[in-house]
Every structure is written in structure tokens, then in C-alpha cells.
């Protein structure tokens, strides 16, 4: 993508939440380095369909573009897939859906969304990766306008002082 002053990283267009914007060029360089070197702790929240098999687990399938698709998918490393690692923990099981917290250790495009689709629990509202825009819970039917993935918390070194800072 285009290098723009202040923009340190990106979120998918439908993902809500915390975004880091640098105030100076020097800060931007340092913050981008921290993202590239995987020094930033990222925590996302999501509502996924169904219930994960485990209360917490690592999802470590390599990701890449499929041969005939623009979608990102699980692709073996031998076919060009790149390392992708996401830790999740189930916060609450809701019957037809679950509330999870995710910590991606790598920052691949659509990583969390693809990992949950692969697991059979797509993010609610994610039309690209099999998530429907309707959720039925406790006798109610809820329509959602976007996928239910939220960048909840970022922790990184302040670009000037080096002190660890957290934003939610």
C-alpha cells in the first residue's frame, strides 16, 4: 500500500477499534518498526458462529491467496503460504455463537477471519468468509451491518520514551 504520513498500520474496512497514528515522521518510523518486528501486542474481540472445540488454542495455519480466488485462505507453505499464528481464548459460549479474544502473533491480511473460518467458526457478519449477516440467539434474531471483529487493545513502546503504553 501507499506510505502516508501518520498511518502506522491498517484494519480491514469493516473492523472497528484502536488504530495507531503517528504525530511525527520519526515516531512513524519507530512505530512501523515495532509492528514489523512483532513487538506490538494486539488483542481483538470477535463474535464467532458456534462454539470452538477448545477454551483456548493456537491457530497456526499458513495463509496465502488461493489459485483461483482473491480471498485469502489456508495454503501450504510449499504452495506459497506464509506463516500465520493466532492465539484465541473463549470468553463466553452463547450457544449458537461465542465471544472470543484473539491475539495475532503475525499480521497477515484477514488472518483472524481466515483462521476462524478454517476452524469452522466464521466471524459473525463476515460475508467474505462464510459469516452470515444474521445471528439467532436466545430466541432473538439480530441483523448485523458488518463483521463483528474489533481491535480492542494495542500495547507497544512509546516511540520517544520507550515506555510501554496501552490503548483500548
Which residues does each PLM region occupy?
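RNA pseudouridine synthases
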Residues: 1-168
Amino acid at each position: 500500500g501507499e506510505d502516508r504520513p501518520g498511518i502506522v498500520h491498517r484494519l480491514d474496512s469493516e473492523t472497528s477499534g484502536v488504530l495507531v497514528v503517528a504525530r511525527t515522521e520519526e515516531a512513524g518510523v519507530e512505530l512501523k518498526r515495532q509492528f514489523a518486528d512483532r513487538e506490538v501486542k494486539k488483542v481483538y474481540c470477535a463474535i464467532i458462529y458456534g462454539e470452538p472445540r477448545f477454551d483456548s488454542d493456537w491457530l497456526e495455519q499458513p495463509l496465502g491467496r488461493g489459485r483461483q480466488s482473491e480471498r485469502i485462505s489456508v495454503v501450504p507453505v510449499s504452495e506459497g503460504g506464509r506463516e500465520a499464528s493466532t492465539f484465541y481464548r473463549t470468553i463466553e459460549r452463547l450457544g449458537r455463537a461465542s465471544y472470543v479474544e484473539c491475539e495475532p502473533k503475525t499480521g497477515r491480511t484477514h488472518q483472524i477471519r481466515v483462521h476462524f473460518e478454517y476452524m469452522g467458526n466464521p466471524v459473525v457478519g463476515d460475508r467474505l468468509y462464510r459469516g452470515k449477516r444474521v445471528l439467532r440467539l436466545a430466541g432473538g434474531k439480530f441483523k448485523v451491518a458488518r463483521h463483528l471483529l474489533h481491535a480492542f487493545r494495542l500495547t507497544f513502546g512509546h516511540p520517544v520514551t520507550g515506555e510501554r503504553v496501552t490503548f483500548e
